[in-house]
Amino acid sequence: MYLAFDRRVILGTRAVKTHTMDFGAFDSVNAPFAAEVNAHGLVVNEAVLPGCDPHFPLQDGLCRDVFLLKLVPGVDPRIFDALLHLGIRGIVIEAFGAGGVQFIRRDLTAKLHEAIHNGVSVVVCSQCLYERSDFSLYEVGQRALEQGVIQTFDMTSEAAVTKLMWVLGRTCDRLEVAKWFSANLVGEISPGVC
């Protein structure tokens, strides 16, 4: 899937709306434009186009029980209790910087462990639009990894939510979910990042 807007074509998994009023409302995050229209016509960047496996099965069943949580300083860990009570099967967490989840005072790691132990798939990405997350860099990310969260590398949060909905439509097994998230299916992860 692609998004074509303002003479630019963006890979759908990399498209993010960055402006509310500007005609160039969308940007391609962590990937060049797939194509641009200029005075010479449509100029396609073949290197950006993801390979297509003709035997890849069409799977249109999506799990709607996915929640996106943007961390803010001091977020109450009981938010995870509420999400478990609602029957959420997947959580995408927009963490701090390269990968940080608070564990001092309001410790989220115990609640991450509880959610994962109860069968919830928890994937983590960065609130930063550009570059990749790496939860192994700092203690605030390492503790989250120890609980079993799944990294999204340089995926946008929009792509992470969509991918989690798609994967949970296929399987609830956490190891299978992690396997799918370490695979670049349609250009959502830059080559060589994971």
Predicted feature descriptions by range:
Residues 98-194:
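C-terminal non-catalytic interaction/assembly regions of soluble proteins
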Residues 2-4, 11-93, 97-98, 103-104, ...:
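Accessory alpha-helical/coil subdomains and C-terminal extensions
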